Each structure stands twice: as structure tokens, then as C-alpha cells.
Amino acid sequence: GRYLEKIKRIVEPLKNKEGFNLVSVEPDGDYNRTVVTLLGDPKSIIEALIPFVGKVEEEIDMNVQSGEHPRMGAVDVIPFIPIEGATMEDCVAYAEEVGERINTEFSIPIFLYAEAARQKRRVKLPTIRKGEFEGMKEKIKEDKWAPDFGKAEIHPTFGVIGVGARNPL
């Protein structure tokens, strides 16, 4: 949210792509986070999320990031929301696919949340986020907080990502 040139570089992999639109990029300086909204073909979005996460990994070090909003990773959450004929079941499948791919590509641990959660304690995002990036280093080592994808060890500069399927807020 505070570094506009960095935000421009990070969202570049999402611009002018076939199959989806980059609907909004909303930086918030107080929270020091940026909400990015994509709308379109889920498979196209998933393909674009991989280089996007790679760019975020290059640009953001969570060890020096601070802001008012609770956070656990440089890309904090990736929610899939059923609209335009997509079902919640579709969104759960997309969440699982993108979570597995991001973990495979970048060794970033993934927690599935909301409708995609595999455990009841992971349905609510604030429960997963509790302790934030700094506390996640120890939390992830507990058996009950082992990630859905990846090792029980946070990415040293990126943290972890919550990937979910949920209805619009």
C-alpha cells in the first residue's frame, strides 16, 4: 500500500492478459496493503497468479513490512468467489489448484480457508492469521497448523498465503 512504484511493478503480470480483467488495484497506506481484484476465466487467472506471486516474492520482504491490518504473507489471501455461473465447488477446486501450484513453484506454505478449508479451525481467516507473520514461524510447527500445501516452515521473506473459496463480502 505505500510504495506506488513497487505496486506498479508487482501488478504488471496481471495487465492486458487474455481471459480476465484487472478490475482494480486499491492501495491503502495505513494498512500498507493493496487489494487487487481480477474478474474472468478462472484458468486464465490461475495462470497469471503464478508470475504475479513470483513478482511479489522479488519485491516484498515481510521481515521489514508493517501496517495496521493483520497479515501473514506478502500475498495475504487469494479468495475465489463464485459469480457468473461458477459454483462454490468450482471455487474450492480453483483454490486447491492455485494453492498447490504456488507451493510447488515457490515453496510458500498454503492454508486453505473458508469453504475450501479442510479443517474446521481453518474456516475463519482471522483464526489462521492469529499471530501474524511474526508468530507464524512457530505456529506452523504445531501439528494442528501444518499447512495444506507445503512444509511446516514459513517462506523466510514471503510468509504464507491463505487461499480460499467464499461468497462476496
Give the label of every model feature segment:
Residues 1-169:
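Long, contiguous binding/interaction regions
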